[in-house]
Protein backbone atom coordinates (compact mmCIF):
# COMPACT_ATOMS: atom_id res chain seq x y z
CA UNK A 1 0.00 0.00 0.00
CA UNK A 2 1.24 3.49 -0.77
CA UNK A 3 0.32 5.59 2.23
CA UNK A 4 2.67 8.54 1.75
CA UNK A 5 2.62 11.89 -0.02
CA UNK A 6 4.97 14.75 -0.77
CA UNK A 7 8.59 15.65 -1.43
CA UNK A 8 8.84 18.58 0.98
CA UNK A 9 5.79 18.47 3.29
CA UNK A 10 5.84 14.68 3.61
CA UNK A 11 3.02 12.60 5.08
CA UNK A 12 2.68 8.93 5.95
CA UNK A 13 -0.67 7.78 7.31
CA UNK A 14 -1.13 4.49 9.17
CA UNK A 15 -3.74 2.33 10.85
CA UNK A 16 -7.11 0.76 10.11
CA UNK A 17 -10.66 1.68 11.05
CA UNK A 18 -11.02 -1.05 13.69
CA UNK A 19 -7.37 -1.39 14.69
CA UNK A 20 -5.97 0.01 17.94
CA UNK A 21 -5.16 3.40 16.43
CA UNK A 22 -4.70 5.49 13.32
CA UNK A 23 -2.18 8.26 12.77
CA UNK A 24 0.23 10.22 10.65
CA UNK A 25 3.91 11.11 10.45
CA UNK A 26 4.66 14.59 9.08
CA UNK A 27 8.23 15.11 7.88
CA UNK A 28 9.72 18.35 6.60
CA UNK A 29 7.99 20.60 9.12
CA UNK A 30 10.26 23.58 9.87
CA UNK A 31 11.73 23.69 13.37
CA UNK A 32 9.88 26.26 15.43
CA UNK A 33 6.61 25.96 13.50
CA UNK A 34 3.69 26.73 15.81
CA UNK A 35 1.54 23.79 16.92
CA UNK A 36 -1.58 25.30 18.46
CA UNK A 37 -3.17 22.28 20.15
CA UNK A 38 -6.48 24.05 20.78
CA UNK A 39 -6.77 25.00 17.12
CA UNK A 40 -5.88 21.47 16.02
CA UNK A 41 -8.42 19.96 18.43
CA UNK A 42 -11.09 22.28 17.06
CA UNK A 43 -10.41 21.15 13.50
CA UNK A 44 -10.44 17.49 14.55
CA UNK A 45 -13.82 18.00 16.23
CA UNK A 46 -15.31 19.26 12.96
CA UNK A 47 -14.60 15.89 11.32
CA UNK A 48 -15.21 13.63 14.33
CA UNK A 49 -18.15 11.22 14.07
CA UNK A 50 -21.27 11.57 16.17
CA UNK A 51 -21.39 15.36 16.22
CA UNK A 52 -24.38 15.94 13.95
CA UNK A 53 -27.69 14.15 13.16
CA UNK A 54 -26.52 13.59 9.57
CA UNK A 55 -23.52 11.59 10.79
CA UNK A 56 -22.86 8.04 11.97
CA UNK A 57 -23.85 7.06 15.51
CA UNK A 58 -20.28 5.90 16.10
CA UNK A 59 -18.82 8.44 18.50
CA UNK A 60 -15.06 8.96 18.59
CA UNK A 61 -13.34 11.77 20.46
CA UNK A 62 -10.50 11.78 17.90
CA UNK A 63 -8.16 13.06 20.60
CA UNK A 64 -4.68 13.46 19.14
CA UNK A 65 -1.63 12.19 21.01
CA UNK A 66 1.62 13.63 19.66
CA UNK A 67 4.40 11.08 20.10
CA UNK A 68 7.38 12.96 18.67
CA UNK A 69 8.49 16.11 16.90
CA UNK A 70 6.93 18.67 19.25
CA UNK A 71 8.00 20.48 22.41
CA UNK A 72 6.51 23.49 24.17
CA UNK A 73 3.94 24.04 21.42
CA UNK A 74 6.52 24.16 18.63
CA UNK A 75 7.87 21.72 16.06
CA UNK A 76 11.36 20.46 16.87
CA UNK A 77 12.30 19.69 13.27
CA UNK A 78 12.15 15.94 13.88
CA UNK A 79 9.35 13.93 12.25
CA UNK A 80 6.04 14.87 13.85
CA UNK A 81 4.16 11.69 14.75
CA UNK A 82 0.53 11.86 15.90
CA UNK A 83 -1.73 9.00 16.96
CA UNK A 84 -5.52 8.82 17.37
CA UNK A 85 -6.91 5.86 19.28
CA UNK A 86 -9.96 3.97 17.98
CA UNK A 87 -12.07 3.80 21.12
CA UNK A 88 -15.54 2.83 19.84
CA UNK A 89 -15.24 -0.07 17.42
CA UNK A 90 -17.83 -2.83 16.99
CA UNK A 91 -16.03 -5.34 14.81
CA UNK A 92 -18.76 -7.92 15.40
CA UNK A 93 -20.94 -5.99 12.97
CA UNK A 94 -18.63 -7.22 10.18
CA UNK A 95 -18.06 -10.83 11.25
CA UNK A 96 -21.08 -12.21 9.40
CA UNK A 97 -20.26 -10.53 6.10
CA UNK A 98 -16.48 -10.92 5.81
CA UNK A 99 -16.79 -12.95 2.60
CA UNK A 100 -19.67 -10.96 1.13
CA UNK A 101 -18.33 -7.96 -0.72
CA UNK A 102 -20.04 -4.63 0.02
CA UNK A 103 -21.12 -2.88 -3.22
CA UNK A 104 -19.54 0.55 -3.64
CA UNK A 105 -16.76 -0.25 -1.17
CA UNK A 106 -13.16 -1.30 -1.83
CA UNK A 107 -13.87 -4.80 -0.45
CA UNK A 108 -13.58 -6.74 -3.71
CA UNK A 109 -10.78 -4.68 -5.27
CA UNK A 110 -8.81 -4.89 -2.01
CA UNK A 111 -9.53 -8.61 -1.65
CA UNK A 112 -8.08 -9.27 -5.10
CA UNK A 113 -5.07 -6.97 -4.76
CA UNK A 114 -4.04 -8.12 -1.27
CA UNK A 115 -5.14 -11.76 -1.67
CA UNK A 116 -7.61 -11.51 1.20
CA UNK A 117 -4.95 -10.46 3.71
CA UNK A 118 -6.23 -6.90 4.26
CA UNK A 119 -8.38 -5.98 7.28
CA UNK A 120 -12.01 -5.66 6.07
CA UNK A 121 -13.52 -4.42 9.35
CA UNK A 122 -15.05 -1.02 8.76
CA UNK A 123 -13.12 -0.85 5.50
CA UNK A 124 -9.75 -1.25 7.22
CA UNK A 125 -7.11 1.04 5.70
CA UNK A 126 -9.58 2.02 2.95
CA UNK A 127 -11.92 3.60 5.51
CA UNK A 128 -12.89 7.25 5.60
CA UNK A 129 -11.71 7.09 9.21
CA UNK A 130 -8.20 7.57 7.80
CA UNK A 131 -9.18 11.13 6.90
CA UNK A 132 -8.75 12.02 10.60
CA UNK A 133 -4.93 11.92 10.27
CA UNK A 134 -5.27 14.06 7.14
CA UNK A 135 -7.17 16.67 9.13
CA UNK A 136 -4.40 16.69 11.75
CA UNK A 137 -1.74 17.19 9.07
CA UNK A 138 -3.92 19.76 7.34
CA UNK A 139 -4.33 21.69 10.59
CA UNK A 140 -0.56 21.84 11.00
CA UNK A 141 -0.28 23.02 7.39
CA UNK A 142 -2.96 25.67 7.91
CA UNK A 143 -1.07 27.12 10.86
CA UNK A 144 2.00 27.46 8.62
CA UNK A 145 -0.01 29.04 5.82
CA UNK A 146 -1.64 31.54 8.17
CA UNK A 147 1.83 32.90 8.91
CA UNK A 148 1.94 33.78 5.19
CA UNK A 149 -1.51 35.37 5.20
CA UNK A 150 -3.26 32.42 3.54
CA UNK A 151 -6.72 31.43 4.78
CA UNK A 152 -8.71 28.38 3.70
CA UNK A 153 -12.40 27.57 4.04
CA UNK A 154 -15.19 25.54 2.49
CA UNK A 155 -18.93 25.06 2.50
CA UNK A 156 -21.54 22.50 1.53
CA UNK A 157 -22.28 23.40 -2.08
CA UNK A 158 -24.94 20.73 -2.54
CA UNK A 159 -26.59 17.72 -0.90
CA UNK A 160 -28.96 15.44 -2.81
CA UNK A 161 -29.54 18.10 -5.46
CA UNK A 162 -30.27 20.91 -2.97
CA UNK A 163 -27.75 23.64 -3.84
CA UNK A 164 -26.16 26.40 -1.78
CA UNK A 165 -24.92 29.67 -3.30
CA UNK A 166 -21.43 29.67 -4.82
CA UNK A 167 -18.41 31.56 -3.53
CA UNK A 168 -17.90 34.99 -5.07
CA UNK A 169 -14.97 33.91 -7.27
CA UNK A 170 -13.32 37.33 -7.08
CA UNK A 171 -14.51 38.72 -3.76
CA UNK A 172 -14.45 35.75 -1.37
CA UNK A 173 -12.44 36.82 1.67
CA UNK A 174 -10.83 35.47 4.84
CA UNK A 175 -13.69 36.68 7.04
CA UNK A 176 -16.20 34.62 5.07
CA UNK A 177 -13.99 31.53 5.16
CA UNK A 178 -13.34 31.78 8.91
CA UNK A 179 -17.05 32.27 9.58
CA UNK A 180 -17.94 29.06 7.76
CA UNK A 181 -15.57 27.06 9.97
CA UNK A 182 -17.65 27.91 13.04
CA UNK A 183 -20.61 25.89 11.77
CA UNK A 184 -21.14 22.12 11.80
CA UNK A 185 -23.23 22.61 8.65
CA UNK A 186 -21.44 25.43 6.81
CA UNK A 187 -23.54 27.21 4.20
CA UNK A 188 -23.46 30.57 2.46
CA UNK A 189 -27.27 30.59 2.39
CA UNK A 190 -28.59 29.35 5.77
CA UNK A 191 -32.07 28.85 4.28
CA UNK A 192 -30.72 25.81 2.44
CA UNK A 193 -30.00 23.91 5.67
CA UNK A 194 -33.56 22.70 6.28
CA UNK A 195 -34.13 21.15 2.82
CA UNK A 196 -30.66 19.57 2.87
CA UNK A 197 -31.24 18.03 6.29
CA UNK A 198 -34.67 16.85 5.17
CA UNK A 199 -33.11 15.07 2.18
CA UNK A 200 -30.63 13.31 4.48
CA UNK A 201 -33.40 12.30 6.90
CA UNK A 202 -35.49 10.90 4.05
CA UNK A 203 -32.53 8.84 2.82
CA UNK A 204 -31.89 7.50 6.32
CA UNK A 205 -35.55 6.52 6.69
CA UNK A 206 -35.35 4.69 3.36
CA UNK A 207 -32.22 2.82 4.57
CA UNK A 208 -30.28 4.70 1.92
CA UNK A 209 -27.71 7.50 1.64
CA UNK A 210 -27.02 10.67 -0.35
CA UNK A 211 -23.96 12.52 -1.64
CA UNK A 212 -23.18 16.10 -2.51
CA UNK A 213 -20.60 18.70 -3.45
CA UNK A 214 -18.11 20.71 -1.37
CA UNK A 215 -16.68 24.02 -2.58
CA UNK A 216 -13.31 24.99 -1.13
CA UNK A 217 -11.32 28.23 -1.43
CA UNK A 218 -7.98 29.68 -0.40
CA UNK A 219 -7.32 33.42 -0.29
CA UNK A 220 -4.02 35.22 0.12
CA UNK A 221 -2.15 32.83 -2.17
CA UNK A 222 0.42 34.84 -4.11
CA UNK A 223 0.90 34.55 -7.85
CA UNK A 224 3.64 32.20 -9.04
CA UNK A 225 3.10 29.05 -6.94
CA UNK A 226 3.11 25.73 -8.80
CA UNK A 227 4.63 24.43 -12.02
CA UNK A 228 3.32 23.42 -15.44
CA UNK A 229 2.39 19.84 -16.29
CA UNK A 230 3.17 17.35 -13.50
CA UNK A 231 3.71 19.89 -10.74
CA UNK A 232 0.61 21.94 -11.45
CA UNK A 233 -1.55 23.21 -8.62
CA UNK A 234 -4.45 21.21 -10.07
CA UNK A 235 -2.32 18.04 -10.21
CA UNK A 236 -1.17 18.25 -6.61
CA UNK A 237 -4.57 19.21 -5.17
CA UNK A 238 -6.31 16.52 -7.23
CA UNK A 239 -3.90 13.81 -6.09
CA UNK A 240 -4.77 14.60 -2.49
CA UNK A 241 -8.48 15.06 -3.18
CA UNK A 242 -8.76 11.65 -4.80
CA UNK A 243 -6.96 10.16 -1.80
CA UNK A 244 -10.15 10.91 0.15
CA UNK A 245 -12.27 7.75 -0.30
CA UNK A 246 -15.60 9.44 -1.14
CA UNK A 247 -14.32 11.92 -3.76
CA UNK A 248 -15.23 10.99 -7.35
CA UNK A 249 -14.75 14.27 -9.25
CA UNK A 250 -13.03 17.63 -8.86
CA UNK A 251 -13.34 20.88 -10.81
CA UNK A 252 -11.37 24.12 -10.55
CA UNK A 253 -13.10 27.45 -11.10
CA UNK A 254 -16.00 26.99 -13.49
CA UNK A 255 -14.75 23.49 -14.30
CA UNK A 256 -16.93 21.59 -16.76
CA UNK A 257 -18.93 24.75 -17.45
CA UNK A 258 -15.87 26.16 -19.26
CA UNK A 259 -16.48 23.62 -22.03
CA UNK A 260 -19.68 25.45 -22.95
CA UNK A 261 -18.11 28.95 -23.02
CA UNK A 262 -16.33 30.87 -25.73
CA UNK A 263 -12.80 32.05 -25.11
CA UNK A 264 -14.05 35.60 -24.76
CA UNK A 265 -16.20 34.44 -21.84
CA UNK A 266 -13.76 32.02 -20.21
CA UNK A 267 -10.69 34.27 -20.27
CA UNK A 268 -10.14 36.26 -17.09
CA UNK A 269 -9.45 39.85 -18.18
CA UNK A 270 -6.60 41.52 -16.27
CA UNK A 271 -5.93 45.04 -15.04
CA UNK A 272 -3.48 46.91 -12.84
CA UNK A 273 -4.41 47.23 -9.16
CA UNK A 274 -1.93 49.69 -7.68
CA UNK A 275 1.47 48.11 -8.23
CA UNK A 276 -0.03 44.66 -8.69
CA UNK A 277 -2.10 42.79 -11.25
CA UNK A 278 -5.61 41.44 -10.67
CA UNK A 279 -8.27 39.70 -12.75
CA UNK A 280 -11.77 41.00 -13.35
CA UNK A 281 -13.21 37.47 -13.21
CA UNK A 282 -12.00 34.11 -11.94
CA UNK A 283 -13.36 31.43 -14.25
CA UNK A 284 -10.08 29.50 -13.94
CA UNK A 285 -10.20 29.18 -10.16
CA UNK A 286 -7.03 31.14 -9.46
CA UNK A 287 -4.79 28.85 -11.53
CA UNK A 288 -3.51 29.25 -15.10
CA UNK A 289 -0.81 27.11 -16.65
CA UNK A 290 -0.73 25.10 -13.43
CA UNK A 291 0.48 28.19 -11.53
CA UNK A 292 -1.44 30.46 -9.16
CA UNK A 293 -2.26 33.90 -10.56
CA UNK A 294 -3.04 35.69 -7.30
CA UNK A 295 -6.81 35.22 -7.43
CA UNK A 296 -8.66 33.01 -4.91
CA UNK A 297 -7.92 29.33 -5.51
CA UNK A 298 -11.33 27.65 -5.77
CA UNK A 299 -12.35 24.07 -6.48
CA UNK A 300 -15.40 21.86 -6.05
CA UNK A 301 -15.32 18.18 -5.13
CA UNK A 302 -18.11 15.67 -5.73
CA UNK A 303 -18.75 13.34 -2.78
CA UNK A 304 -20.50 10.10 -3.60
CA UNK A 305 -23.31 8.66 -1.43
CA UNK A 306 -22.03 6.63 1.51
CA UNK A 307 -21.82 3.04 0.16
CA UNK A 308 -22.80 1.41 3.48
CA UNK A 309 -26.59 1.30 3.41
CA UNK A 310 -28.99 -0.90 5.37
CA UNK A 311 -31.22 -1.97 2.48
CA UNK A 312 -30.63 -5.32 0.79
CA UNK A 313 -28.09 -5.31 -2.07
CA UNK A 314 -26.98 -7.92 -4.59
CA UNK A 315 -23.35 -9.01 -4.24
CA UNK A 316 -21.08 -12.07 -4.26
CA UNK A 317 -19.73 -14.37 -1.56
CA UNK A 318 -16.05 -14.89 -2.43
CA UNK A 319 -15.70 -17.85 -0.06
CA UNK A 320 -18.60 -19.79 -1.56
CA UNK A 321 -18.05 -18.35 -5.06
CA UNK A 322 -21.75 -17.64 -5.47
CA UNK A 323 -24.17 -14.73 -5.75
CA UNK A 324 -25.52 -13.41 -2.47
CA UNK A 325 -27.68 -10.75 -0.86
CA UNK A 326 -26.17 -8.38 1.68
CA UNK A 327 -27.83 -6.28 4.37
CA UNK A 328 -25.20 -4.13 6.11
CA UNK A 329 -25.42 -3.77 9.86
CA UNK A 330 -23.40 -1.23 11.83
CA UNK A 331 -23.28 2.53 12.26
CA UNK A 332 -22.90 4.55 9.10
CA UNK A 333 -23.34 8.09 7.79
CA UNK A 334 -26.46 8.65 5.67
CA UNK A 335 -24.46 11.60 4.29
CA UNK A 336 -20.74 12.16 4.70
CA UNK A 337 -20.68 15.63 3.14
CA UNK A 338 -20.83 17.83 6.31
CA UNK A 339 -17.94 15.94 7.94
CA UNK A 340 -15.92 16.01 4.72
CA UNK A 341 -15.86 19.82 4.54
CA UNK A 342 -12.86 20.11 6.88
CA UNK A 343 -11.18 17.22 5.05
CA UNK A 344 -11.29 19.17 1.78
CA UNK A 345 -9.91 22.24 3.54
CA UNK A 346 -7.11 20.07 4.95
CA UNK A 347 -6.05 18.56 1.64
CA UNK A 348 -5.90 22.04 0.09
CA UNK A 349 -3.71 23.21 2.98
CA UNK A 350 -1.38 20.22 2.60
CA UNK A 351 -1.15 20.81 -1.16
CA UNK A 352 -0.38 24.51 -0.77
CA UNK A 353 2.31 23.78 1.83
CA UNK A 354 3.93 21.27 -0.51
CA UNK A 355 3.76 23.72 -3.42
CA UNK A 356 5.06 26.67 -1.39
CA UNK A 357 7.97 24.60 -0.05
CA UNK A 358 8.80 23.37 -3.55
CA UNK A 359 8.77 26.95 -4.84
CA UNK A 360 10.98 28.11 -1.95
CA UNK A 361 13.48 25.32 -2.67
CA UNK A 362 13.67 26.27 -6.34
CA UNK A 363 14.15 29.95 -5.53
CA UNK A 364 16.88 29.12 -3.02
CA UNK A 365 18.76 27.08 -5.61
CA UNK A 366 18.54 29.77 -8.29
CA UNK A 367 19.18 32.79 -6.06
CA UNK A 368 21.90 34.89 -7.64
CA UNK A 369 21.80 32.82 -10.83
CA UNK A 370 18.74 34.21 -12.62
CA UNK A 371 19.43 37.95 -12.33
Report residues per predicted region.
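Generic N-terminal targeting/processing segments that precede catalytic cores or assembly contacts
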Residues: 1-371
Amino acid sequence: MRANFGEHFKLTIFGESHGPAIGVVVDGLPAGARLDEDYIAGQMARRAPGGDPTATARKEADAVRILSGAMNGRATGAPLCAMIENTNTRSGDYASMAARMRPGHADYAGYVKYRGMNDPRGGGHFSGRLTAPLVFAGSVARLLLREKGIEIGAHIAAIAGERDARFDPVGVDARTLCGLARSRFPLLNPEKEAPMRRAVAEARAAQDSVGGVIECAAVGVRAGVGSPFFGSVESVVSQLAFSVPAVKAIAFGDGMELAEMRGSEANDAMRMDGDGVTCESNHNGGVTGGITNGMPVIFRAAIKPTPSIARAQRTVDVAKRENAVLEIAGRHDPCIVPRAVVVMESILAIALCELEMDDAAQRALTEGVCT
